[in-house]
UniProtKB/Swiss-Prot annotation:
This is Probable 2-(5''-triphosphoribosyl)-3'-dephosphocoenzyme-A synthase. The keyword Methyltransferase does not apply. Involved in the formation of 2-(5''-phosphoribosyl)-3'-dephosphocoenzyme-A, the prosthetic group of the acyl-carrier protein of the malonate decarboxylase. HAMAP family: MdcB (MF_01883). Its EC number is 2.4.2.52. It catalyses: 3'-dephospho-CoA + ATP = 2'-(5''-triphospho-alpha-D-ribosyl)-3'-dephospho-CoA + adenine. The keyword Nucleotide-binding applies.
Length: 291
């Protein structure tokens, strides 16, 4: 009989949700070949980002995601106290990210989206369907944080200029790009036997085919957005990333977006949100974690 229990303690629900959020960000970063985005091949359309930086940034956010889940467990309901706690924790997480990356914004949009989803999942751990988690996240997003900084982000400025839905509105409407595009395509491609990496690429492309990506609009205007949406649809129409014809179209899209300096960072954040909701829906947080 051993004198000590050498087994690792079971992670708490908050720890497990933070694990899943960070895993989703790393899985998104590693996914290759993504058009004009940082991946295992290179930096895409970015001069200030690389894969190692994306990994370090994701890992730096683990404490913030855990604290968001803990806040949801403590406060127990959708309301202004939780919304403002999430805002404060998110801003602290952003500072930790910037300290890690030397001031480069790697995951600001992801802190917002995944933070809301982590908190929403913690509020009702047994209600794991993607729709129910997204609805709770939307109810949180609709509440006004009195302490949020007033200056508009680049994404918010672009959303106003072009009259499109930004990251804030995407969350407030219950993540339609995730529930209607990313997750259904992920499941379809899996069902067709395309393999997990191809299924994730197809999910990204499905989001890109319809999303008014404010990152693309900021960097390349309406021409860039049109190229992204039409090119992504062409890949899917050719059979997706698992087919030879689809791969050719994907390569063409990559070159076109690189030429336009159009990096679909908004779509990448929503792919990470799709991957997180997929894991929550499968019961990974509840099955491996406990309060």
């Amino acid at each position: 009989m051993h004198a000590f229990n050498l087994q690792s303690p079971t992670p708490s629900l908050a720890e497990r949700l933070a694990d899943l959020a960070v895993d989703a960000l790393i899985d998104e970063a590693d996914l290759s070949p993504k058009p004009a985005l940082v991946d295992r091949r290179g930096n895409g359309a970015h001069t200030d980002l690389h894969l190692g930086l994306m990994h370090a940034s994701a890992l730096s956010l683990w404490p913030a995601f855990k604290e968001m889940a803990d806040a949801a467990l403590l406060l127990g309901q959708v309301g202004l106290p939780l919304r403002e706690a999430l805002g404060r924790i998110g801003r602290e997480g952003e500072q930790a990210m910037l300290a890690t990356t030397g001031g480069v914004n790697t995951h600001r949009g992801a802190i917002w989206a995944l933070g809301l989803l982590v908190a929403a999942a913690a509020l009702e751990p047994q209600a794991t369907s993607a729709g129910s988690v997204a609805l709770r996240a939307a109810r949180l997003a609709l509440l006004e944080d009195r302490y949020a900084p007033r200056p508009l982000s680049h994404g918010a400025q672009v959303a106003l200029r072009y009259g499109v839905r930004g990251a804030r509105e995407e969350a407030q409407q219950g993540f339609p790009a995730v529930l209607q595009l990313g997750l259904p395509q992920l499941k379809r491609s899996r069902a067709q036997g395309h393999g997990e990496q191809n299924a994730r690429l197809d999910a990204l492309l499905a989001i890109m085919s319809r999303l008014a990506d404010t990152c693309v609009l900021y960097r390349a205007g309406e021409l860039g957005l049109q190229a992204m949406q039409q090119g992504a649809r062409a890949v899917l129409d050719a059979g997706g990333s698992a087919t030879l014809a689809g791969r050719r179209r994907l390569h063409e899209l990559d070159l076109q977006l690189l030429t336009l300096n159009a990096s679909p960072g908004g779509a990448a954040d929503l792919l990470a949100a799709s991957l997180l909701l997929d894991r929550i829906e499968s019961g990974d947080a509840v099955n491996q974690g406990a309060n």
